[in-house]
A protein has these predicted regions:
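Short beta-strand-centered aromatic/proline hotspots
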Residues: 21-25, 62-70
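Short, basic/aromatic beta-hairpin or loop at an interaction surface
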Residues: 18-35
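Short, solvent-exposed secondary-structure boundary/capping segments
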Residues: 31-39, 70-85
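Short coil-to-beta transition motif at edge beta-strands of beta-rich domains
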Residues: 5-11, 41-55
């Protein structure tokens, strides 16, 4: 999976099912050497600490952890931390 860009569409698989997300920010994670923080807008009952899968276009999956959730109207701004494979 490549590092996403702002405005990229993403698919997340969670314990409540699949949901679509839009990437709004991509940052290096200072807590981990290879880590990335992804801010996405998505719908669903996300909770801090929740584990999710990010599904790439080719169907491969990368695990991520919900670091922060900010409620916005119907959508939520969700910050995910992950390590993307090289």
């Amino acid at each position: 999976m490549q590092r996403p860009n702002v405005d990229d569409d993403m698919t997340l698989v969670t314990d409540f099912g699949k949901t679509e997300a839009i990437c709004v920010d991509v940052l290096d994670n200072p807590a981990t050497e290879e880590g990335v923080l992804l801010k996405v807008m998505a719908r669903g009952p996300f909770e801090q600490g929740q584990q999710v899968w990010i599904v790439d276009r080719d169907g491969s999956k990368v695990g991520a952890t919900v670091e922060n959730v900010s409620e916005q109207t119907i959508d939520s701004e969700v910050t995910l931390s992950t390590v993307l494979p090289a």
